[in-house]
Amino acid sequence: MLRKLNTPTTTLVRAASTRVEKLEEIRERLSKGPNFQDFIQNSDGVKEDWENYDGKLRREKGETQQLRLPPWLKTTIPMGKNYAKIKSQLRDLKLSTVCEEARCPNIGECWGGGEHSTQTATIMLMGDTCTRGCRFCSVKTARAPPPLDVNEPVNTAKAISSWGLDYIVLTSVDRDDLPDGGSKHIAETVREIKARNSNIFVECLVPDFRGDLECVKTIASCGLDVYAHNIETVEKLTPFVRDRRAHYRQTLQVLREAKNFNPNLITKSSIMLGLGETDAEVEQTMQDLREVGVECLTLGQYMQPTKRHLKVIEYVTPEKFKHWEQRGNELGFLYTASGPLVRSSYKAGEFFITSILANRRKSV
């Protein structure tokens, strides 16, 4: 009997067939196994209730090990048609958003419409490079960023008008290299937006302009609805958290004078928690903001963007955030948004502020 010999061609065919079978087996196992969403949830697919969480929430002095991210800070992956549409147009028009640059955890909710269908976005003007180096912020820094894009005000207004947004937040990098800090550029963007849609509500989250009150006046009188400037942290921690050119008292002065220049404005600020502040210091900061007329306040958890930035000292519980929300209401803030994932441009706050501004317009 003749034995059938294996030719090189026969061997290759068998090897290829085996690889195909293995690939099919892997695909089947993957289809039946956990998906990516499962990896950002607990093993049972349900996020733990914070009251039952027994992980370490605070780093003691001298400890170097990073804290484990608690379950209430884990968010879903951004997706959906509105999200994809906005992201695509931003790329086409070469616009930046703080939502992406600062790695905001609420990007999917805001760009997609969320619970109240108040679709929002936060555009970052004047490029993606800042002249300051705050130790909590992931935005790129340089002493001399690229020059301003003269077409940015028009491009921004075009994009926003095509999105059909209800509420837009304009923020910016600091531009200490410019004589006016970029205030005229921001103001021109607001005017372009309002010229295309007078009904849209515009919030400007702006720098301190080195305390230059003429720059503050330029912004306050440009037609915006909400003037926002973040105090970020308590007074004692300010030199260690913010760039040395940013001062606690200077921030308070900017917020006070913005309101003086335009009493019809809503003024707004934000505090990060988890940097080592005490309750008494948070309380004092909230009182200081109320004393200069700030009407809206957000409080959220600081989250370390990279290993080069400040480490989280404490993960504040949802219960404690609820306490600060109640305290803000007691102090007389028009609105207090306080929660682990709340950011200065928080969507639920924008929905509330939109209602307030709409009522004000009706009464005029």
UniProtKB/Swiss-Prot annotation:
Pathway: Protein modification; protein lipoylation via endogenous pathway; protein N(6)-(lipoyl)lysine from octanoyl-[acyl-carrier-protein]: step 2/2
GO molecular function: 4 iron, 4 sulfur cluster binding; lipoate synthase activity; metal ion binding
Keywords: 4Fe-4S, Iron, Iron-sulfur, Metal-binding, Mitochondrion, S-adenosyl-L-methionine, Transferase
Residues binding [4Fe-4S] cluster 1: C99, C104, C110, S345
Cellular component GO terms, alphabetical: mitochondrion
Catalytic activity: [[Fe-S] cluster scaffold protein carrying a second [4Fe-4S](2+) cluster] + N(6)-octanoyl-L-lysyl-[protein] + 2 oxidized [2Fe-2S]-[ferredoxin] + 2 S-adenosyl-L-methionine + 4 H(+) = [[Fe-S] cluster scaffold protein] + N(6)-[(R)-dihydrolipoyl]-L-lysyl-[protein] + 4 Fe(3+) + 2 hydrogen sulfide + 2 5'-deoxyadenosine + 2 L-methionine + 2 reduced [2Fe-2S]-[ferredoxin]
Enzyme Commission designation: 2.8.1.8
Signal peptide (residue range): none
Co-factor note (free text): Binds 2 [4Fe-4S] clusters per subunit. One cluster is coordinated with 3 cysteines and an exchangeable S-adenosyl-L-methionine.
InterPro entries attached to this UniProt entry: Aldolase_TIM (IPR013785), Elp3/MiaA/NifB-like_rSAM (IPR006638), LIAS_N (IPR031691), Lipoyl_synth (IPR003698), rSAM (IPR007197)
Enzyme class: transferase
Cofactor: [4Fe-4S] cluster
Classification via SUPFAM superfamilies: Radical SAM enzymes (SSF102114)
Domain Radical SAM core: 116-334
Main location: mitochondrion
PROSITE patterns the UniProt entry points to: RADICAL_SAM (PS51918)
Residues engaged in binding [4Fe-4S] cluster 2: C130, C134, C137
HAMAP family per the UniProt record, alphabetical: Lipoyl_synth
PANTHER family: LIPOYL SYNTHASE, LIPOYL SYNTHASE, MITOCHONDRIAL
Miscellaneous comment: This protein may be expected to contain an N-terminal transit peptide but none has been predicted.
Family (UniProt): Belongs to the radical SAM superfamily. Lipoyl synthase family.
Protein name per UniProt: Lipoyl synthase, mitochondrial
Protein encoded by which gene: Las
